[in-house]
Amino acid sequence: MFFRFPEDARWNADGQAVEFGVGIGEYEGVVRVPRQVFGRFIDGAVTPERCLEAYHLHRTRLERVVERKLRNRQLTDDGNVEVNGRDLRVLPRGASMAYSDFATR
């Protein structure tokens, strides 16, 4: 399976979230990462600009979470993907605690 993540990250003011596209095969969807999720990456005020900056700094990690959610068919009612704080705490299969400690810093 090849996932596609176009370079289209943007701030959604109505949803207070960073959104970006994802595709696999014929599926095309939108990933939403709410503002409060970025609080773990940002010291100080969690502004839209800083959320987008944090997205780019942690893009690979967020994309891996999205891949896992799509493989497990964890979609929202509208067929898209929403990443929450719990998704970022889940250990990948076979990962050690040392990896977990490193990944959350």
Residue ranges of model-derived segments:
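Short, charged/polar N-terminal "headpieces" of proteins
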Residues: 1-27
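Intrinsically disordered, low-complexity regions enriched in Ser/Pro/Gly/Gln/His and often acidic
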Residues: 2-4, 34, 48
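Flexible, active-site-adjacent loop/turn segments at secondary-structure boundaries
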Residues: 3, 36-40, 86
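Compositionally biased, intrinsically disordered low-complexity regions enriched in proline and serine
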Residues: 4-6, 28, 39, 56, ...
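A short, structured beta-strand/loop element
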Residues: 19-42
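Acidic, low-complexity intrinsically disordered segments
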Residues: 46-105
